[in-house]
Regions:
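Extreme N-terminus of proteins, especially the signal/transit-peptide cleavage junction
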Residues: 1-4
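C-terminal cap of thioredoxin/glutaredoxin-like
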Residues: 6-7, 13-32, 111-228
Length: 228
């Protein structure tokens, strides 16, 4: 039976996560699914898996900015350059990890994404977080105070560690049942999973998952005509 929950791993530093968040409620509603938003620290995922972030690779950063501008235009979703990038998302992520009522928490998450990617506000600043908290009716001053407590810090750390243990390596990532999907571009496959029509062939996948290509060997073996 298809899963009725989409676990959504995100970090405000990702414009793809913002685009995904604008579309996820409608997608979930089509299948009567609930959304379980899980803030994680993208930098923690990168470190755990030995990766560089897109912003650390200039060619990739430029390509992704252009690619996301195209996606936003097709979706008719506003997308503007952030005030700073990369930036420290910890305070906003910790605030989003607090035990708020689900509707209020979703409103806060949406407002924080919009603050970064539409309004060019610097969500690393407590005053900005307080303002946004007031705008969505969750009490900005209390929100900032709670987000700075050890419990909020521990929650974000635990969520990030759990995501890593589940194989999450980037944001946004969506978990439907036991299947992990990565990036806004995977939404068609998320939808198929929610509909109970995942096209992945189990027998074929067993062949792929049983294959072994040590990374050290891949780095040593190059085509004869490769130029170093």
């Amino acid at each position: 039976m298809p899963s009725s929950t989409v676990r959504f791993y995100f970090d405000y530093i990702s414009s793809n996560a913002y685009l995904a968040w604008t579309q996820l409620p409608a997608l979930a509603a089509r299948y009567g699914a609930t959304i379980d938003p899980v803030p994680v620290l993208f930098a923690g995922l990168l470190e755990a898996h030995g990766q560089l972030g897109p912003a650390e690779i200039p060619a990739k950063s430029l390509w992704m900015a252009k690619n996301n501008a195209r996606k936003a235009a097709v979706l008719s979703v506003p997308l503007n350059p952030p005030a700073f990038h990369p930036f420290n998302p910890l305070l906003a992520l910790r605030a989003s990890s607090l035990a708020l009522e689900p509707a209020a928490r979703n409103a806060l998450i949406g407002a924080l994404f919009e603050a970064v990617w539409v309004r060019a506000l610097h969500v690393s600043e407590p005053a900005v977080l307080e303002r946004i908290g007031d705008e969505v009716g969750v009490g900005g001053a209390a929100l900032v105070a709670q987000a700075q407590q050890p419990e909020a810090k521990a929650s974000l750390r635990r969520q990030t560690d759990d995501a890593i243990a589940r194989g999450v390596f980037g944001v946004p990532s969506m978990l439907v049942g036991d299947e992990l999907f990565w990036g806004y571009d995977d939404f068609p496959y998320v939808e198929l999973a929610l509909a109970g029509r995942d096209p992945l062939d189990a027998a074929q996948w067993r062949q792929w998952s049983g294959a072994s290509w040590p990374s050290a060997m891949r780095r040593r073996v190059r085509p004869d005509n490769a130029k170093l």
